[in-house]
């Protein structure tokens, strides 16, 4: 044990001597073997009154912050021009006013909207109510025809069951002598 302690002291002082750093005396003798470990330049201070600060491992917030920055950028990139466009439309065009419909004139479906942007969207992107009505009527007609065909099919199946006829009469049955029953008679062979 004493040899290990002596070896440790010698190695520390040798490293300190080679590096050029001064060592403080440990026992007061100032000899080569009695020197201690290198002293720190300043006492160790921990910031705050709660002792040593710890390094907590947390998940990275890089992607969250990047996403939020890009979200703000693209909202500003699209939101500002849209706000300017809506303001210009409201100032220079304005909302539609209710007026008397001339005799014999049938208004288009987008003319019932008050705001010009709503009118433009209804004219270019929405279907007219007549088209929606016709499409719904076509779907209802197809569903009614399908239901009627299902009822007819049920009636046909019921009559086939009652009368004893069916699709098996349309196919010729094979001769019984052609069927080989030997695998069933001796399954272990």
Swiss-Prot record:
Q: Which organism is it from?
A: Pongo pygmaeus (Bornean orangutan)
* UniProt keyword terms in alphabetical order: Electron transport, Membrane, Mitochondrion, Mitochondrion inner membrane, Respiratory chain, Transit peptide, Transmembrane, Transmembrane helix, Transport
Q: Which residues form a coiled coil?
A: none
Topology of the protein relative to the lipid bilayer: Single-pass membrane protein
**Main subcellular localisation:** mitochondrion
- Is Transport found in the keyword set? yes
Give the protein family: Belongs to the complex I NDUFB5 subunit family.
Q: What is this protein called?
A: NADH dehydrogenase [ubiquinone] 1 beta subcomplex subunit 5, mitochondrial
Domain of life (superkingdom)? Eukaryota
What InterPro entries has UniProt attached to this entry?
Answer: NADH_UbQ_OxRdtase_B5_su
Assembly and partners are described as: Complex I is composed of 45 different subunits.
């Amino acid at each position: 044990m004493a040899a290990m302690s002596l070896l440790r002291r010698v190695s520390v002082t040798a490293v300190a001597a080679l590096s050029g750093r001064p060592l403080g005396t440990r026992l007061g003798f100032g000899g080569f073997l009695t020197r201690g470990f290198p002293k720190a330049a300043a006492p160790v201070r921990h910031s705050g009154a709660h002792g040593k600060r710890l390094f907590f491992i947390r998940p990275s917030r890089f992607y969250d912050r990047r996403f939020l920055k890009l979200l703000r950028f693209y909202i500003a990139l699209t939101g500002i021009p849209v706000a300017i466009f809506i303001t210009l439309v409201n100032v220079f065009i304005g909302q539609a006013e209710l007026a008397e419909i001339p005799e014999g004139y049938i208004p288009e479906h987008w003319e019932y909207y008050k705001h010009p942007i709503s009118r433009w969207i209804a004219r270019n992107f929405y279907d007219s109510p007549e088209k929606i009505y016709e499409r719904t009527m076509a779907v209802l007609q197809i569903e009614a025809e399908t239901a009627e065909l299902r009822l007819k099919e049920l009636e046909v199946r019921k009559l086939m069951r009652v009368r004893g006829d069916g699709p098996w009469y349309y196919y010729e049955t094979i001769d019984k002598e052609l069927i080989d029953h030997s695998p069933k008679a001796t399954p272990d062979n």
